[in-house]
């Protein structure tokens, strides 16, 4: 398989962004065993490919085990992933668990099955990680997934919450990591096409796509077309939170604010401090109708005293 210079730049960018995310969040450490969850989609293929490349030149030693969950969906091409994983030489395990039948039994016809399916799948993944001795679980969510989740939670849940690049499972036994957190979906899709990964379609279960997520995705893509770089800026905002300028009393002690306590940058109270401050304009019966907004000074007490004494003698 021959590739162009553009491909190698793309590959380098994905590896660099993944390596930076791993370093920034301490995702992988020396001696870790990482269970790499493979769905057969572009994201998980890309994640495995990038992690294998980084593993070869990393200054630490860690083990990768690829895992696919065969949920017994009708028509699932169960031969594709084992053949691919053998061809790239990674250790792997195929876990069979008939979650499909459970979902079909519990969810009414025509309703989205993704929520229950993901919960059942998560339980199997955690159990598999425990049995294999894997302390890290790698998922293929990327930057766009994280931003979409942020808006979904804000629009439909009333929370400022996204997908963390790294989190601990509820029982505290495993750490879930998202190595592609800094990577764009566009780059991942381009890489997957160039690598000719044997993609397994994600609609085998017959479930409808999450319509809310689809709408949010379309909204973000429309913003990106109008203002290139918008999604990246939103993701950067998730990494640069200023609690004092939000309204969550659990994150910032608003009730404890008082005069004489310099809690925040005063200038930032009036807006973005990176813009050059413009002179204030005044209209009216004054000598000068233009002044710089720097500070106001009161006359010294000594200068005001004679005037007060004079007034008292009259």
From Swiss-Prot:
GO terms for cellular component: cytoplasm. Pathway: tRNA modification. [4Fe-4S] cluster binds at residues 114, 117, 205. A motif (PP-loop motif) lies at residues 39-44. It catalyses: cytidine(32) in tRNA + S-sulfanyl-L-cysteinyl-[cysteine desulfurase] + AH2 + ATP = 2-thiocytidine(32) in tRNA + L-cysteinyl-[cysteine desulfurase] + A + AMP + diphosphate + H(+). Its cofactor is Mg(2+); [4Fe-4S] cluster. It is found in: Cytoplasm. GO terms for molecular function: 4 iron, 4 sulfur cluster binding; ATP binding; magnesium ion binding; sulfurtransferase activity; tRNA binding. One of its GO terms (biological process) is tRNA thio-modification. Its EC number is 2.8.1.-. It is an enzyme of class 2 (transferase). Keywords: 4Fe-4S, ATP-binding, Cytoplasm, Iron, Iron-sulfur, Magnesium, Metal-binding, Nucleotide-binding, RNA-binding, Transferase, tRNA processing, tRNA-binding. Binds 1 [4Fe-4S] cluster per subunit. The cluster is chelated by three Cys residues, the fourth Fe has a free coordination site that may bind a sulfur atom transferred from the persulfide of IscS. It holds the Pfam family ATP_bind_3. Transmembrane segments: none annotated. PANTHER family: AMINOTRAN_5 DOMAIN-CONTAINING PROTEIN, SULFURTRANSFERASE-RELATED. Belongs to the TtcA family. The thiolation reaction likely consists of two steps: a first activation step by ATP to form an adenylated intermediate of the target base of tRNA, and a second nucleophilic substitution step of the sulfur (S) atom supplied by the hydrosulfide attached to the Fe-S cluster. Catalyzes the ATP-dependent 2-thiolation of cytidine in position 32 of tRNA, to form 2-thiocytidine (s(2)C32). The sulfur atoms are provided by the cysteine/cysteine desulfurase (IscS) system. Homodimer. This is tRNA-cytidine(32) 2-sulfurtransferase.
